[in-house]
Amino acid sequence: MDKKLISWMGVAITNHDFTPRGYQLEKRYFSTFIKADDIAFYVFCPYTTLLKFVESKKAKFPKKLHWEGLHKIHFILHKFGVAPAEEVIAEIKDYERKPKLKEFRELAIKLVAAHKDSVKPNENVLEYVEVRSEALGVHEKIPLVIDNHPVIEYFVEMVLPPSYEDQLRLTLYALLLEEKFNIDIDYGFAEYPLMKVSHKIQIDSDLRKDAITKRAEMEKIIIEKKVDREVPVDIKKCNTCYYQDECPYWRRGKIQFFV
């Protein structure tokens, strides 16, 4: 790998060999902090970076409250070691009809009410762990951490392999936790609570290298205010994008990046 120093408007990023852990902390300087989740969005589609960081557009999360409620239930189940009974799973699956986050929280409380006197909370199950890394130029509130391992959650009634962007998201979570707790983390988890399935995801050096490389690519786009390539439209992906309403290009046969 070329070891020359690349400079973008005074922001220097060292393009040199990565350590076996997947990244090199020396001589790495960033002008801004970027959320790990936004890096995953960039991998999903580079135009999301322009929309958010250059044009100040807002993503729309129509099921955000539903996700937060389901996450809270999932967290409570792990925290207190309560097995999700079939009737609970059935109620969770019916979450679409529930209009308020309060109802989810009430359900989560009910799940542990019968166990609160006999079951102690697991201190190794953490929620919304906030980490800010000067070395990586990344910050995030990690939704779920179990025994120091990051977890990504899928509240769907199927089990599909985690996408590449979600693997990078998990990797960035691991890098942040490694720095916060001064430990090595070699794997995380993808969990499917509605299916009672948990998969271990290895966080290897390639994923680590890719995560840091993608973060550097985002920095370049933000500074230059453009993406120097065209991205074919994938209708299935575009229809699930949180920036769809703000994207002026997705209905075309090809997304062109000009700002």
Features from the language model and the residues they span:
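Structural signature of nuclease core domains in nucleic-acid processing machines
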Residues: V151-M158
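Acidic active-site catalytic centers that drive phospho-/nucleotidyl reactions
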Residues: P143, E153, R169
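Short, charged, amphipathic alpha-helix that recurs within catalytic cores of restriction-modification
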Residues: D166-L177
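Metal-dependent nuclease catalytic regions and adjoining charged, substrate-binding loops involved
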Residues: E123-G137, P161-Y164, E179-V259
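Short, surface-exposed beta-strand-loop junctions and turns on beta-sheet-rich folds
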Residues: K57, M158-P161
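Metal-dependent nuclease catalytic cores that hydrolyze phosphodiester bonds in DNA/RNA
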Residues: M1-P150, V259
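Active-site catalytic microenvironments for nucleophilic, acid-base chemistry
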Residues: S56-K57, L175-K180
